[in-house]
């Protein structure tokens, strides 16, 4: 066997082994790619993304190292209280996101940036959400589940949910801009809460302006009366002065003829 044949006989198996290792790295996630406390499994159905399950893992925050090819992310039943802006940016394949049974209290404008084109289901039920930014769900095509939260029904919530086609009859108003709507379903709020807030602001401005106007009028009245009182006292003082006696040869009227 020539040296060339010997080299080829050894190099070809090595090349095949190297190719196999590369394919395994590309096609199957290694243990280091899965967030701590979670399990990752490759989906058998197209597009063969990852199913990442972090349920009941006592997480206090959303893992920042979720693999970019994740298509299902289960974060339910943890202690997550905050959804940072752009935390899911880069998860372009994510279809289902489960954040139910956590301690989230509010949602900012950029909480779900990057999921507009892929997300199909977003579950936020059984949290502590009272308020959201009016654009928190903007451009999302997903079915958003937000029931069983202590909502404060205001203009921002009406703007956030009003343009969505999904039914929110189970969203109850724990508190509301309208007192008679407290404890009622959000869908039963017929009033325009945004116009209500605007009218409330207008009324406050009118009351403030009326108060200032009343103060100015009161000052003017006080100033005029004070001047009248000073003038009256001055006139009484002048009247109290003794008159100058006339001289015998002084005429009654003095006229000047030009």
Curated annotation (Swiss-Prot):
<comment type="similarity">
    <text>Belongs to the LRRC3 family.</text>
</comment>
<dbReference type="Pfam" id="PF13855">
    <property type="entry name" value="LRR_8"/>
</dbReference>
<dbReference type="InterPro" id="IPR003591">
    <property type="entry name" value="Leu-rich_rpt_typical-subtyp"/>
</dbReference>
<keyword id="KW-0732">Signal</keyword>
<dbReference type="InterPro" id="IPR000372">
    <property type="entry name" value="LRRNT"/>
</dbReference>
<feature type="domain" description="LRRNT">
    <location>
        <begin position="34"/>
        <end position="68"/>
    </location>
</feature>
<feature type="signal peptide">
    <location>
        <begin position="1"/>
        <end position="33"/>
    </location>
</feature>
<protein>
    <recommendedName>
        <fullName>Leucine-rich repeat-containing protein 3B</fullName>
    </recommendedName>
</protein>
<keyword id="KW-1133">Transmembrane helix</keyword>
<feature type="glycosylation site" description="N-linked (GlcNAc...) asparagine">
    <location>
        <position position="51"/>
    </location>
</feature>
<feature type="domain" description="LRRCT">
    <location>
        <begin position="149"/>
        <end position="196"/>
    </location>
</feature>
<dbReference type="GO" id="GO:0005615">
    <property type="term" value="C:extracellular space"/>
</dbReference>
<keyword id="KW-0472">Membrane</keyword>
<dbReference type="GO" id="GO:0031012">
    <property type="term" value="C:extracellular matrix"/>
</dbReference>
<feature type="repeat" description="LRR 3">
    <location>
        <begin position="118"/>
        <end position="139"/>
    </location>
</feature>
<feature type="repeat" description="LRR 1">
    <location>
        <begin position="69"/>
        <end position="90"/>
    </location>
</feature>
<keyword id="KW-0433">Leucine-rich repeat</keyword>
<dbReference type="InterPro" id="IPR032675">
    <property type="entry name" value="LRR_dom_sf"/>
</dbReference>
<keyword id="KW-0812">Transmembrane</keyword>
<dbReference type="InterPro" id="IPR001611">
    <property type="entry name" value="Leu-rich_rpt"/>
</dbReference>
<feature type="transmembrane region" description="Helical">
    <location>
        <begin position="204"/>
        <end position="224"/>
    </location>
</feature>
<dbReference type="Pfam" id="PF00560">
    <property type="entry name" value="LRR_1"/>
</dbReference>
<feature type="repeat" description="LRR 2">
    <location>
        <begin position="93"/>
        <end position="114"/>
    </location>
</feature>
<keyword id="KW-0325">Glycoprotein</keyword>
<feature type="glycosylation site" description="N-linked (GlcNAc...) asparagine">
    <location>
        <position position="98"/>
    </location>
</feature>
<keyword id="KW-0677">Repeat</keyword>
<dbReference type="GO" id="GO:0016020">
    <property type="term" value="C:membrane"/>
</dbReference>
């Amino acid at each position: 066997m020539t040296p060339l044949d010997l080299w080829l006989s050894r190099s070809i198996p090595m090349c095949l082994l190297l190719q196999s290792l590369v394919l395994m790295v590309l096609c199957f996630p290694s243990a280091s790619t899965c967030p701590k406390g979670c399990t990752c499994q490759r989906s058998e159905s197209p597009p063969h993304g990852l199913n990442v399950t972090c349920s009941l893992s006592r997480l206090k925050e959303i893992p920042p190292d979720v693999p970019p090819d994740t298509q299902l992310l289960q974060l339910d039943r943890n202690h997550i209280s905050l959804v940072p802006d752009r935390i899911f940016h880069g998860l372009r394949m994510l279809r289902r996101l489960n954040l139910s049974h956590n301690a989230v209290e509010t949602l900012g404008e950029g909480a779900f940036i990057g999921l507009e084109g892929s997300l199909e289901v977003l579950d936020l039920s059984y949290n502590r959400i009272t308020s959201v930014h009016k654009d928190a769900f903007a451009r999302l095509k997903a079915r958003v589940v937000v029931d069983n939260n202590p909502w404060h029904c205001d203009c921002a919530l009406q703007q956030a949910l009003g343009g969505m086609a999904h039914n929110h009859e189970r969203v109850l108003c724990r508190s509301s801009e309208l007192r008679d709507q407290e404890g009622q379903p959000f869908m039963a709020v017929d009033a325009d809460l945004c116009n209500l807030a605007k009218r409330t602001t207008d009324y406050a401005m009118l009351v403030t302006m009326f108060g200032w106007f009343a103060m100015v009028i009161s000052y003017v009245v006080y100033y005029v009366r004070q001047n009248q009182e000073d003038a009256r006292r001055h006139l009484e003082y002048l009247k109290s002065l003794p008159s100058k006696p006339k001289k015998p040869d002084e005429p009654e009227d003095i006229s000047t003829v030009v």
